């Protein structure tokens, strides 16, 4: 790995780079390549998204959404991200096709400071349009727009958790009445079974904003003991 945010700490750092555990994680930007990603029509990525000299994935112009070639069910996803001023992006997971649209739950990424009047469930690290924070004690730890932040998503069985810079923001269950009610109140209410599927693709969204990702690692948790 080229770099890791300081808050990872020695325990997590050792976990991610030790020979034994490294085999459990897949580097989704391995060898500075986009071979593990594709466009929605299955084509290779040829414009918009590019790997920079420092190994980061940079969306500088319109490049369309990127879908992982593989599907993931239960997983532990780590990533670093940086967004432009007034920017909006996100990482979707368990993505599947609904009619002509690829939809899934989303770890929202945006310049929150530019949208003070936006609904809270659109803030960074929310489950986009469904949940803001799962408890009042949860709080976001912001960094400057010129710095990378660190995101983490653990999806295991019915439990969904989002972290931002080491702080837990979302802790929800997709089999709860609270979740069902949130879907009914969201833009996805017309999509039958939205959020109920337990496997699908990852998606890096293109909303017309400049965004950067690096150190994108995923570990499959299917059949594994519950991660605390």
Name each model feature, range by range.
Residues 22-228:
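Carbohydrate-interacting regions of secretory-pathway proteins
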Residues 1-6:
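Positively charged n-region of N-terminal signal peptides that target proteins for export
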Residues 7-16:
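Bacterial N-terminal signal peptides
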